[in-house]
Amino acid sequence: NNIGAKHAIGNYILILNPDIILTQGAIDKLYNYAIKHPSCGIVAPKLQNRDCSLQYSARRFPSIKILLNRALTKGNDKSGNKNVQTYLLKNLPMDTPTEVDWCMGAAFLISHTFYNELKGFDEKFFLYVEDMDICYRCWKKNKKVVYYPLSKMTHVHQRSSQRLNKKTLIHLKSFFYFFRKNRFKIKSEAQHLTSAPQREKETFQLQPKVVPSK
């Protein structure tokens, strides 16, 4: 991504994985939203599976506890674990534009100037978590990360970390690098998540911060 960005000449950079299938107008909707809302640093579409079911691509920043829960559930998004459900924002209505901590890097739009200001993706991440990291740095620059479900894309996502294999270990290594890089002081940045209760029994009391839809 960083190599491609160096050769980009437009005002905005679209990060797009090769396994993304675009729907009509999806890119235009992201672009139109971005230019109308300069406080938004990163805007990401709704990602769905081939069967049109939702992919939980918008998430909150994890804690070590959530990371361990994800490892124990083998990254299963259908896990009933309350911490995992909170991490995946399953308790929030995700049918309107919403400020979120971070979105999967399979698809998102960012201004060229801001991308350069962030110095792009951290190349010390060999695989995984670099999308979480750039969103975290976006918030630290006082820019928002917005999940924009009016733009829809299909992500032919093949989860490769369902079993404890080499890729799973790389994923875990990237998570721990992210925590170590930020001195293990990770907290939610989106306004509706910042004041969210931390105790497990209260994890479903988050309130969404809905943002303008146009």
Task: Describe each model-derived feature in a short phrase.
Residues 62-100:
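Short, flexible, basic/aromatic active-site loop/helix in glycosyltransferases
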Residues 21-57:
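Conserved donor NDP-sugar-binding/catalytic core segment of glycosyltransferases
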Residues 1-8:
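Glycine-rich, basic loop-to-helix element that forms the pyrophosphate-binding segment
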Residues 16-18:
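Catalytic metal- and UDP-sugar-binding loop of GT-A-like glycosyltransferases, i.e.
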Residues 20-21, 125:
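Acidic metal-phosphate-binding loop of nucleotide-sugar-dependent transferases
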Residues 93-95, 101-152:
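A short, conserved alpha-helix in the catalytic core of glycosyltransferases
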Residues 132-210, 214:
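Active-site-adjacent helix/loop segment of glycosyltransferases
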Residues 13:
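Short aromatic/hydrophobic "clamp" motif used to bind/position activated sugar donors
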